[in-house]
Amino acid sequence: MIFRRVARGVFPMFGDGKTTYHPLYIDNLVDAFIAAMQLDVGNGEAYLIADENYVEIEKLVKAVAAALGVDVSIPHYPLFPLVAAGHVCETLCKPFGVTPPIFPRRVDWYRQNRAFDIRKAKRDLGYRPLVGLTEGLARTASWYRSEGYLPLPDIASASVR
């Protein structure tokens, strides 16, 4: 979980951090579903639903840190050893029915670009993502804290910032 790792203050970045990620805040997804249902369009059609813009993963990590109100160190490491470790772990764990701690799909977060074109949803459904990245991350951080997934902010240190 990105938020938990960032909250610890260090987020290891494998590769250059320029891989793109296209976030989607849940309210935006729900809005798209409601629009499709109310307009009764798109039967049998596929739509890509995402927030307005994609973001490089290092910038996403920094935005999560801002939403949490914490400083984060982002040391960079070469990607290849992680890719190799993912394949080795998966190969060794699979025969024993053990979920590997690292596997190729998890490593892909650092290396596969995910940037989508939402124009079709905008055109056909009138889709407009209303909650932007900064607000969505702030709401997510608040929810994680209220549900106990993240510690509450330290009031004393927060006031010093």
Residue ranges of each PLM-predicted region?
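NAD(P)-dependent short-chain dehydrogenase/reductase
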Residues: M1-D31, A35, V64
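Residues at helix-coil transition
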Residues: A7-R8, Q38, G69, R145-S146
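Low-complexity, charge- and small-residue-enriched intrinsically disordered regions
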Residues: V10-G15, T20-I26, E90-R114
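Conserved loop-to-helix N-cap of the C-terminal "lid" that shapes the substrate pocket in Rossmann-like
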Residues: G17-V30, A46, Y54-E58, A115, ...
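Mid/C-terminal beta-alpha module of Rossmann-like enzyme folds, strongest
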Residues: A35, L39-I102, I118, A138-R139, ...
